[in-house]
Amino acid sequence: MEFKHKKKYGQNFLNNKDEILNKIIEVSNIDDNDEILEIGPGQGALTSLLVERVKKITCVEIDKDLENTLRKKFSSKENYTLVMEDVLEVDLRRYINQGTKVVANIPYYITSPIINKIIENKDLIDEAYIMVQKEVGERICAKSGKERGILTLAVEYYGESEYLFTIPREFFNPIPNVDSAFISIKFYKDDRYKNKISEDLFFKYVKAAFSNKRKNIVNNLVTLGYSKDKIKEILNQIEISENERAENISIDKFIELIKIFEGR
């Protein structure tokens, strides 16, 4: 019986497999010592290549209608584990080890929650290679300009991102409304930013700074209770224009800014 894609799970499977899948394997630097977490394996197109190349692969799939297909294809593989659960709810510590690498075509409608889940488990996950909407990929990897936002800085706080390549929408079934991007996130081995400023403080200021993207940094930071004069004084100390928008401020400048506000 033909599989019916479910909109509620954001299912868009690759149909021009070889060209894209081989490129994914190549840029993800797969080797036989890798332990892989694949989120949303679908019908197992990427899984088929990974399972033959890595030490261990754990696939997390929410759609029960795909369980039989996946078990039939891969249950004989000793290095393969299928977890039929919602990736946002599952305790990944039960299934993956330190040094795990994520390689996945993730459901686009929950991109941010999945990235947050990966970040929450960064003590186990060293690197993530994921397919996302092109626009989201550009935002995550943007070094400056209007594409930058809270998600950009959230990723930068924990690791380095890179836009690897674009995948046209025609390569998927059903064809989505947008092109896709394959990106990487490599987590820092040290806590380079966490050692400078806590997560709570960092995100408190970043969320305020981006609370209204049409407003400049001064008008957004007043939501934290500071006067405009105080904000302008501190911005002047670190050579940021009072008319600047948050999207044009680097993570290092943000941390410098927060430290002054917090008297550190």
Curated annotation (Swiss-Prot):
Disulfide-bond pairs as recorded: none
Gene responsible for this protein: rsmA
SUPFAM superfamilies named in the record: S-adenosyl-L-methionine-dependent methyltransferases
Function (record text): Specifically dimethylates two adjacent adenosines (A1518 and A1519) in the loop of a conserved hairpin near the 3'-end of 16S rRNA in the 30S particle. May play a critical role in biogenesis of 30S subunits.
Record: residues binding S-adenosyl-L-methionine: N12, L14, G40, E61, D86, N105
Keyword 4Fe-4S in record: no
PANTHER family the UniProt entry points to: DIMETHYLADENOSINE TRANSFERASE, DIMETHYLADENOSINE TRANSFERASE-RELATED
The keyword Methyltransferase is assigned to this record: yes
Lineage, highest ranks first: Bacteria, Fusobacteriati, Fusobacteriota, Fusobacteriia, Fusobacteriales
EC numbers on record: 2.1.1.182
Reactions catalysed: adenosine(1518)/adenosine(1519) in 16S rRNA + 4 S-adenosyl-L-methionine = N(6)-dimethyladenosine(1518)/N(6)-dimethyladenosine(1519) in 16S rRNA + 4 S-adenosyl-L-homocysteine + 4 H(+)
Protein name as catalogued: Ribosomal RNA small subunit methyltransferase A
Swiss-Prot/TrEMBL GO biological process terms: rRNA methylation
Pfam family, one: RrnaAD
